[in-house]
């Protein structure tokens, strides 16, 4: 019988993941005795070779929240098709909640023109030349997830 957990961990160790914290927020829950304080961390993990994921972790201290976010991000990894110029194959729109995002391929040498959370997601995906525009929400988490939505809907065209 194959041990699935061992295979998952072996696969995880072979890939060199880079992780970046997008935001850490203090959140409170009102309980009978007062307010219970905890932290929410939004983390992006990627290998800069076309694999990227966004994770969220909540805990009573920041380091545990970040660690949980990294674990969650590794569970939600997507593969991004890259062109030879490290861009995306075509224009795409991403949406998550009220956050809308437009992603357009750009010429080699242009760089990553994006702001906030989408920039982190695109850099960790290994995309070097892209234009993006955020519309709608200012939420870092929703913009990161909108970026993931757009990247997951990319298609490659075979001639």
Swiss-Prot record:
The keyword Ribonucleoprotein belongs to this UniProt entry's keyword annotation: yes
Example of a GO biological process term: translation
InterPro entries: Ribosomal_Su5_D2-typ_SF, Ribosomal_uS5, Ribosomal_uS5_bac-type, Ribosomal_uS5_C, Ribosomal_uS5_N, Ribosomal_uS5_N_CS, Ribsml_uS5_D2-typ_fold_subgr
Location of the protein in the cell: Plastid, Chloroplast
Keyword RNA-binding: yes
Any single GO CC term annotated in Swiss-Prot or TrEMBL for this entry: small ribosomal subunit
The S5 DRBM domain, residue ranges: 17-80
Domain of life, per lineage: Eukaryota
Predominant localisation class: plastid
Disulfide bonds: none
Molecular-function annotations in GO: rRNA binding; structural constituent of ribosome
Alphabetical list of SUPFAM superfamilies matching this protein: dsRNA-binding domain-like, Ribosomal protein S5 domain 2-like
Keywords: Chloroplast, Plastid, Ribonucleoprotein, Ribosomal protein, RNA-binding, rRNA-binding
Residues spanning the signal sequence: none
Alphabetical list of Gene3D superfamilies matching this protein: 3.30.160.20, 3.30.230.10
Function: With S4 and S12 plays an important role in translational accuracy.
PANTHER family, alphabetized: MITOCHONDRIAL RIBOSOMAL PROTEIN S5
Similarity comment: family membership: Belongs to the universal ribosomal protein uS5 family.
Domains (record comment): The N-terminal domain interacts with the head of the 30S subunit; the C-terminal domain interacts with the body and contacts protein S4. The interaction surface between S4 and S5 is involved in control of translational fidelity.
Subunit description: Part of the 30S ribosomal subunit. Contacts protein S4.
Protein name: Small ribosomal subunit protein uS5c
Taxonomic classification: Eukaryota, Haptista, Haptophyta, Prymnesiophyceae, Isochrysidales
């Amino acid at each position: 019988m194959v041990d699935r957990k061992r295979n998952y961990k072996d696969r995880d160790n072979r890939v060199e993941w880079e992780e970046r914290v997008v935001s850490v927020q203090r959140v409170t829950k009102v309980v009978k005795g007062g307010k219970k304080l905890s932290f929410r961390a939004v983390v992006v993990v990627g290998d800069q070779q076309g694999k990227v994921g966004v994770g969220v972790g909540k805990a009573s201290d920041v380091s545990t929240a970040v660690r949980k976010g990294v674990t969650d991000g590794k569970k939600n990894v997507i593969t991004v098709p890259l062109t030879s110029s490290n861009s995306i194959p075509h224009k795409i729109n991403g949406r998550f909640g009220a956050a809308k995002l437009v992603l357009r391929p750009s010429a080699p040498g242009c760089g990553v023109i994006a702001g906030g959370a989408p920039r982190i997601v695109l850099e960790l995906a290994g995309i070097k030349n892209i234009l993006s525009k955020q519309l709608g929400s200012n939420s870092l988490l929703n913009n990161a997830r909108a970026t993931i939505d757009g990247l997951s809907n990319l298609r490659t065209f075979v001639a």
